[in-house]
């Protein structure tokens, strides 16, 4: 394909580009259509019609064209990952693994990610500058945790005041620890100073407890969470929260957050509350499904599999409850370490749970809306940024194609051809 077209990758062309011969699945939920797509100055000029005489042609015969995929729950800094969350490698190795992770992510068709904890602003800036290929990154910077909460990932015997030493300025920013509204307000402001585009708080324990926490724990008070919401609103952005149990979720909704991460224990009553307050949900099924199959990947005993299996089943039920209640349900992978190259599995899990079209909508239009970029991303429509992915094969008919990254034959990012020729 690359040899046939002669189109180089990596640069935005001044000449208009006409995508010819593909089947367009535009992300709106409408039926697929055989239509050309005209790209001009990094945006979609129109869908359909005939090719302008002066436009360069990119042959997309046999490809299913979808909007650039969005993963709304990633940890790009967790590319080198050890179950103990201690790094025994150099900063150079950490950076190299993160850069490879970014390249693999965009090559898999994810043109945008929302990093929900782990990277400092530097990584997003490097990609934005064009020095390195990778997805567009919206980052929260360091997550906000109470002392002893999920964001304090050092050993239990490690003094709290040493936790900041785990960060790598400009590259890795794990978390800031706060106790009380005033300290949290200061740390949220510090996160914004360091380039955060939104705020993430940890308000319940995790399924895989890093220290002494449990999924049933609630963390931060409603008053503390409300302070973070106030600071985020002052900057025109929002707060999302890591939350599994219903009590923590209800506290966060009462405080004014806009999004819930994971939400694995959401029941019908809580789902109705989310819908009432227009709070979105970003479920993360893949990480739990993977751990059910291989608990040792997180250093867990085989006996942990039964607990993980219960949470995986509950998470699937939570997605269905939220969808039935009318909640905006996005999509996130939450993958860690080298397994991040398998983030596309999330679409397959969701396709099997709901439908391929709904999985695609969650990974495009709905995610774009959740992360605040709905005016520019998420659909193949006139005026949107030209983030487009071409699959060799139809993932709506064969959802396994979502997870087969070698079928991603074309990736455009703001009109730049990032990948062309694979899978044909």
Map each language-model feature to its residues.
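Active-site mouth loops of central-metabolism enzymes
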Residues: 83-96, 163-186, 238-240
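Histidine-rich, glycine-flanked metal-binding segment
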Residues: 2-18, 24-67
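Metal-associated gating/positioning segment near the N- to mid-region
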Residues: 63-129, 147-154, 223, 254-255
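Histidine/acidic residue-rich metal-binding segments in metalloenzymes
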Residues: 181-281, 297, 308-329, 375
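Histidine/acidic-residue-rich catalytic or RNA/ligand-binding cores of hydrolases
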Residues: 80-83, 125, 151, 209-210, ...
């Amino acid at each position: 394909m690359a040899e046939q077209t002669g189109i180089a990758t990596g640069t935005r062309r001044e000449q208009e580009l006409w995508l010819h011969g593909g089947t367009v699945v535009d992300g709106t939920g409408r039926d697929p259509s055989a239509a050309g797509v005209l790209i001009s100055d990094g945006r979609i000029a129109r869908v359909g019609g005939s090719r302008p005489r002066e436009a360069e042609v990119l042959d997309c015969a046999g490809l299913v064209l979808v909007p650039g995929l969005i993963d709304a729950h990633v940890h790009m800094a967790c590319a080198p990952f050890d179950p103990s969350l201690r790094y025994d490698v150099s900063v150079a190795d950490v950076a190299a693994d993160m850069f490879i992770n970014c390249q693999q992510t965009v090559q898999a068709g994810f043109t945008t990610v929302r990093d929900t904890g782990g990277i400092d602003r530097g990584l997003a800036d490097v990609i934005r500058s064009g020095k390195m290929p990778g997805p567009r990154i919206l980052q929260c910077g360091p997550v906000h945790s109470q002392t002893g909460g999920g964001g304090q990932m050092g050993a239990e015997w490690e003094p709290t005041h040493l936790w900041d030493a785990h960060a790598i300025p400009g590259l890795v920013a794990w978390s800031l620890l706060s106790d009380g509204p005033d300290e949290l307000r200061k740390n949220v402001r510090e996160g914004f100073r360091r380039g955060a585009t939104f705020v993430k708080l940890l308000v319940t324990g995790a399924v895989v407890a890093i220290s002494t926490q449990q999924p049933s724990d609630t963390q931060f008070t409603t008053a503390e969470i409300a302070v973070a919401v106030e600071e985020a609103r002052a900057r025109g952005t929002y707060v999302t929260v890591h939350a599994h149990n219903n009590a923590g979720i209800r506290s966060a909704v009462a405080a004014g957050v806009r999004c819930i991460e994971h939400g694995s224990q959401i029941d019908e009553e809580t789902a109705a509350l989310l819908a009432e307050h227009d709070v979105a949900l970003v479920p993360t099924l893949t990480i739990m499904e993977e751990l059910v199959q291989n608990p040792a990947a997180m250093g867990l005993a085989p006996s942990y599999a039964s607990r993980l299996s219960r949470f995986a089943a509950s998470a699937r039920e939570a997605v269905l409850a939220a969808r039935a209640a009318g909640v905006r349900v996005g999509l996130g992978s939450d993958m860690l370490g080298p397994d991040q190259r398998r983030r596309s599995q999330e679409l397959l899990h969701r396709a099997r749970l709901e439908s391929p079209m709904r999985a695609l909508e969650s990974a495009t239009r709905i995610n774009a809306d959740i992360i605040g970029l709905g005016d520019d991303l998420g659909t193949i429509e006139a005026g949107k940024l030209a983030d487009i992915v071409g699959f060799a094969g139809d993932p709506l008919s064969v959802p396994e194609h979502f997870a087969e990254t070698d079928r991603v034959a074309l990736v455009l990012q703001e009109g730049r051809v990032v990948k062309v020729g694979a899978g044909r």
